[in-house]
Curated annotation (Swiss-Prot):
Acidic residues bias locations: 41-86
Descriptive protein name: U3 small nucleolar RNA-associated protein 25
One annotated GO molecular function: rRNA binding
Keyword field contains Nucleotidyltransferase: no
Superkingdom field: Eukaryota
Principal cellular location given in the protein's record: nucleus
Family to which the UniProt record says this protein belongs: Belongs to the UTP25 family.
Cellular-component GO terms for this entry: nucleolus; small-subunit processome
Protein function: DEAD-box RNA helicase-like protein required for pre-18S rRNA processing, specifically at sites A0, A1, and A2.
Subcellular location: Nucleus, Nucleolus
Record keywords, A-Z: Nucleus, Ribonucleoprotein, Ribosome biogenesis, rRNA processing
Region annotated Disordered, chain positions: 1-22, 34-93
A Pfam short name: Utp25_C
Length: 641
């Protein structure tokens, strides 16, 4: 029977208006009341979403010959065991998941973390690699051994090894740098703006997931065969701890159906399967031909091509020779889901009906295209991760005599590997990654940035002004006060502010500025991710023609539409964009006006406010070297050309 969940969803594109601390703005009573005066933007409306609305949910339990499946898996396990028995094979799976209980409990309870970092190059890209380890974990895992072991010496199932070689070819420089951390089950955050590097990373992750799932299934089947033989021979003193509470071992979070489809193709290729069950149904629901206009930036084309539906939750069963889409969740090995789809299924605190037991035994959680999911709703991601590795409410046929000890000890989250793939690391991504507690440790790889100051192709005056904020919570009001006093009031007094584009990251920040400017009777327009297409066109035209002197423009609208705004003579940045490409594109608005002859180059100017809490975004814009100086210096303003 379909279950319904009440969620808040805008009429057009769902965006997060509550996920960040900036959402506190909307709780200011006077501002909320005045926001109601304007009806240009389409406010969020409540819609009833049912389980049947989620692609892939509601699948019934399948009638399968489990004994036949187990026999096939056990046969495969015996064949693969011969390959595993080679004395020079390195097996991080065994080191991680079969660690001695007394030792891993001691290491985990110590909670003594140490961090080290190094600067190196991956290919031609300078990077910083940060390693975080538990003090005594090396006695169990010896990560240094993983780092010096050749990829060919790792234990990988022959079919997967062959499939990955056919899909990928020889390891690339990116993959060589990453595989020791990935295959040693360390938490891993990899940030790169290179689409080719992202693809190489994704192929390696697909292989790792396939290896983990097939290895786990074969181990369970092989041990079941042994137990049956022992029972026939009257032997009952042998036990195997090889299972979780429920069957799914891997969670893959992706922003859209197209992203799911593309990663699934990598998984199929890397696993080397011969058969795809329900392939036609999957292709029809997830694949959509057609590309985004090639006039849009490359990263936009990647994010929004194909099927952009963000409401799905799909169970996938993977075996050595076959893959089955639309598997019943409690019979699936992998759960592919959008944050919105899975959050709707999981429910929220206080809901009468919630379903998250199938997330209780996740051993790998992979966040794919994470920055895109941030723009959708980070709250959904946090909710889903928060419901992972909890004790299930029902047994679901679990054989508790075979549940791994770390599940019974309540330590599942300490064994789960979290993998994050992103273009750039934001404070929200940092927060999630910093709070993972995998006892194998974690590795974070981030670029060393040159910055975006000179990308515009001509010299543009760029001014960065620091303001003080005592804390993250104080930053909200401190930023608004600084913006009004330092930027807005001076601009209005001068009387020369026609053609000013004010960039704000989100709708809630736009609301506060909009209400203030309403009170001061300032001529302006405002467009956001909630604006109708008609309103966007109208305000862009009025701004271009000078009939609205100021245009408030949100980063989320830019993310979803990537408009090229004309008539810009000055750019004012309320809060730095996390995506450095946005900053570059804001500068291009100015250079276009110069090229059009409507703006003197000497008059083109971009002004931005920043605080110590903006240093990650600032680093990507001014460069790694400059941001260190700006962070330590006592100066309040910095100017670049």
């Amino acid at each position: 029977m379909a279950r319904s969940h009440k969620v808040t969803k805008p009429k057009r594109q769902q965006v997060d208006t509550s996920g960040s601390y900036n959402a506190l703005m909307v709780l200011m009573g006077d501002n909320v009341k005045k926001a109601e005066k304007r009806v240009e933007e389409e406010e969020p409306v409540e819609q009833e979403l049912e389980e049947d609305d989620i692609e892939g949910a509601g699948e019934e339990e399948e009638e399968v010959d489990e004994e036949q499946e187990e026999e096939e898996d056990a046969d495969d396990a015996e064949e693969d065991a011969e390959d595993d028995s080679e004395t020079d094979k390195y097996d991080p799976y065994k080191l991680h998941f079969e660690a001695e209980e007394a030792k891993y409990v001691s290491v985990i309870k110590s909670e003594e973390w140490k961090t080290s970092s190094e600067k190196t190059k991956i290919g031609s890209q300078p990077v910083r690699i940060t390693y975080t380890n538990l003090e005594d974990a090396d006695e169990l895992l010896d990560f240094s051994e993983a780092q010096k072991t050749e990829f060919s010496k790792y234990t990988v199932r022959p079919r997967i090894k062959d499939g990955f070689k056919q899909l990928n070819g020889s390891l690339t420089s990116v993959q060589k740098a990453i595989y020791p951390s990935l295959m040693a089950y360390r938490d891993l955050c990899y940030a790169t703006s290179s689409l080719s590097d992202t693809e190489e990373f994704s192929r390696l992750v697909a292989m790792h997931i396939a290896q983990h799932v097939v290895r786990t299934a074969e181990e369970v089947a092989y041990n079941t065969r042994i137990l049956k033989r022992n029972a026939e021979e009257g032997i009952h003193d042998v036990e195997f701890r090889d299972q979780g509470y429920t069957k799914p071992r891997v969670l893959v979070l992706v922003p859209t159906k197209n992203a799911c489809f593309e990663f699934m193709q990598l998984l199929v290729g890397a696993s080397g399967v011969d058969r795809e069950d329900n392939k036609a149904r999957f292709n029809k629901a997830f694949h959509e031909a057609g590309a985004v206009l090639d006039t849009k930036p490359e990263d936009f084309q990647k994010a929004f091509k194909g099927n952009t539906d963000d409401m799905f939750c799909l169970g996938v069963k993977l075996r050595n020779k076959s893959i089955r889409y639309y598997s019943y969740f409690y019979q699936a090995d992998i759960v592919f889901a959008s944050p919105l789809g899975l959050k709707t299924l999981v429910g929220s605190e206080g809901d009468s009906k919630r379903e998250f037991d199938f997330l209780s035994s996740i051993e790998i959680a992979y966040l794919h295209e994470t920055n895109h999911m941030e723009m959708q709703s980070w709250d959904n991601v946090l909710t889903v991760l928060g419901q992972t590795n909890l004790l299930p409410n029902e047994s679901h046929g679990c054989d508790f005599s075979r549940v791994k000890s770390f599940y019974l000890d309540g330590l599942a989250k300490h064994f789960r590997q979290t993998i994050v793939a992103c273009q750039f690391v934001t404070p929200t991504i940092n927060s999630v990654f910093s709070n993972t507690v995998n006892f194998a440790g974690k590795t974070k790889i981030t670029p060393i940035y040159n910055g975006e100051l000179a990308v515009a192709g001509m010299k543009i005056r760029q001014i960065f002004t620091r303001f003080k904020a005592l804390s993250v919570s104080d930053e909200i009001d401190a930023r608004f006060k600084a913006f009004v006093q330092i930027t807005l009031e001076g601009m209005i007094r001068s009387g020369d502010y026609s053609g000013t584009l004010i960039y704000v990251p989100t709708y809630v920040e736009l609301v506060r500025l909009r209400n203030y400017m309403d009170e001061k009777n300032i001529s302006f327009g405002a467009i956001s991710e909630y604006s109708s297409i008609t309103e966007v066109k109208r305000h862009r035209t009025l701004f271009r023609d000078g009939r609205e002197k100021i245009l408030l423009y949100t980063g989320r609208l830019h993310h979803y539409r990537r408009y090229f705004v004309k008539g810009v003579k000055s750019v004012v940045i309320y809060k730095l964009p996390e995506n450095p490409a946005f900053y570059r594109e804001l500068l291009l608005f100015l250079t276009h006006s110069v090229d059009e002859g409507t703006l003197e180059q000497s008059m083109a100017k971009c002004r931005a406010l920043f605080t110590i809490y903006d240093l990650l975004a600032l680093e990507r814009i001014v460069g790694t070297k400059r941001v260190k100086t700006m962070a330590k210096s006592g100066e309040s303003s910095y100017e670049f050309y």
